[in-house]
C-alpha cells in the first residue's frame, strides 16, 4: 500500500514539474489522464494500450501525447485536477458530484462521459453478518474513501433504508479507507480488523470465489437497478479551450467500448497485460461477459446519488437534472 502511494505521489510530482497547466494553449498537445484499479476502467486501458486517443486526435490534425497516472480513489484525483496537474479524471459518481458542487462558481468541473454501469458488492468474511444491520463495533468495512467514495455513499443510502431517516451515517464509524487491492488483501488475510469490503470488479468476484466470503449488499439492489459506477470529468476551462481534444477523446472512448463488445477475449488479455495481473485472461473475459457489467457512455441513476447527497447536505446546490452535471457532448444520450 505504502509503495503504491509513493509511486502515485512521485508520478504526480513529476507531472507537475514537467507539464504545463491545462489549457495553456488553445489545443493541448500533451494530455494528462488518470484512472484507478479494476476492470471498470477497461475502456481507458484499451485507449492507453492501443493509443486510440492519439490515433483519433491525429485524424483531427492534432499531434497528441498522453500521460497516464493511477490513483487509489477519486479524492486525491480531484485535488490534482483542481491544482491543474490533471486534464481528465475518472472515478466514482460520488467524487464527481463532490467536485461539481465545490467548483460550480470557479473551475466548473463537469462530467465528460459515463464510463460504465456496474454493480458494487459489499462482501464479508464474518459468518455472523447476513445484512448490514449485523455489523458491530468489532467489524471494519474497507472501501476506497470514507464518506465520499461511491461505495461510501451507497452504504449510506443502504443504511438509511435499513435503520431509518437520519441514520444514513450509522455505519460510517466502521469504514476504513483502503484501495481495492489492499482492501481485498486485508480482508482475505483473516488477520486484519477488516471483516467487510465494499468493492468493485474484479476484486468482489475474486473474494466470492473463496468459500469463507459471502455477499451482504449489491448496489443494483440498493439503487433499484443498473447504475453508473465510473465517470470521466474535466474542468470547463479545459473543455472550452480544447474542443478537438474533447472530440478525439469521445471518439477514442467509443472506439474502445466497441472493441470490448466485439472482442471480450482480446480486451481481457490487454487488461491482464497492462495491470500485470495474476488473474487469467479467461477469468477476466468471463467477468466482461457478465450481463450486469456494461461499458457505456450513458449516465444511469446519477440523479439518485445527487438527490441523496443534496438531501443530507453533501451537495449544494442540487442539480436540476443529470445534464447539469455533464458537458453538452453527451446531452443527447438517454441519461438519468
Provide a role label for each language-model segment.
Residues 27-168, 172-177, 191, 195-201, ...:
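Short, glycine-/small- and polar/acidic-enriched structural segments
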Residues 55, 75, 79, 83, ...:
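Solvent-exposed, polar/charged alpha-helical surfaces in well-ordered, non-transmembrane soluble domains
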Residues 21-26:
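Signal peptide processing junction and immediate N-terminal pro/mature segment
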Residues 239-316:
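Secondary-structure end/capping motifs
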Residues 10-20:
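Bacterial N-terminal signal peptides
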Residues 1-11:
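Bacterial N-terminal signal peptides that target proteins for export
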Residues 181-272:
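Pocket-lining segment of extracytoplasmic ligand-binding domains
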Residues 309-336:
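Conserved C-terminal helix/tail region of periplasmic/extracytoplasmic solute-binding proteins
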